[in-house]
């Protein structure tokens, strides 16, 4: 049999539910894989084998009684360090929160446990989830490495989760996204990541203060995985509505039939992208056309400059001073670089900036919804560049500005509240590349259908051994 850690989550769940393998066997394989490769990439910062084995044994006990288990039966899943999990610190990569032990699970963690998942460990993140690179001072000052190439960023802020999935440490990673933190790590590591619609997956951290307005409107939780099918089953597991999240909506996972029509935009909002990224979008379009989709290249998207402005308003005008103060007390170079870049921009925002942003958001979202009533999906680049050299944002003001500008399409989209899938289209040499697929609100099914068509006509990501210098 193929080594268990190499299998898809879908295949693992089937084997466990049919009792061809035990959840304990899967857990032991995952722990062995973690021990073998995690020292090379620092993806998982807190793993407690006894807890992992206990989760697995509970699944096996349920099956032994003849009872039903959920869609993720026995599947090892990693949890990001900014998400409440009972008995673990919700550190957000900060020494200030090293002892902030969660007394209850976030709703999405409860959903994963009810689905039969085995929680393998806590994945690394930059301090306060502020960067598209993954390092912090809390965990020994080391940073997470991209398994494909340690010279490239693994992405952020769910860099640990994406690196783990890529290296076969677990089958699914739970991530969060307010500015690309699920989508960019998936892109950088050459796997897939889904940013669900606002309200699709419930989230709440009882260990932390109430979220700011920007966080409530733009922050979502989603999965990273090696196959689109695994994103599909993990989304179904995560999406059970929960009253602790006021934005949570019990929406159906599948919407009404719609013509399979995709809009392709190579340079949204007129932004320059490198030729390799443009070629990836065209390649995705060809694969969709081959799968029977009607594909049309369009000159531009509905408003993105205005949506990016909303994102920035909501981030800088609400709670930024508290965040800046925490970053200064923490002293993390990456967090301080973000604060130094952003602080001068806060002076442009008036007292009513949040209200103005929410008014503008309504106009922008309306135009996107009307567009996506005509097209099932929109396909655009993830980033203007291939994955960055690691820690590029710490190389001075010009380098930070380059990163900020290149990530426009990740920053501009969260305020829309729409589902967005980052799907890998393959490699340029040994460097990952991919596209974003956007659909109407609660139409993750259309994102996933398009993603499956693209994946099926390429080479689906498979777990790899981390790259090490010869």
Regions found by a protein language model. Name each.
Residues 72-221, 265-267, 317, 382-399:
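Short glycine/serine-rich loop/turn segments
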Residues 52-60, 116-117, 126:
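Long amphipathic alpha-helix in the N-terminal Rossmann-like dinucleotide-binding domain
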Residues 20-28, 57-60, 275-299, 323-331, ...:
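Acyltransferase
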Residues 30, 52, 231, 262, ...:
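Residue-level signal for inorganic ion chemistry
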Residues 19, 30, 74, 114, ...:
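Glycine-rich, small-residue loops and helix-cap segments
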Residues 72-92, 151, 256-265, 314-369, ...:
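Short helix-loop capping/hinge segments that flank enzyme active sites or metal/cofactor-binding pockets
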Residues 1-54, 290-292, 463-470:
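An N-terminal boundary/leader segment
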Residues 195-283, 302, 458-470:
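A short helix-breaking turn/cap at a secondary-structure junction
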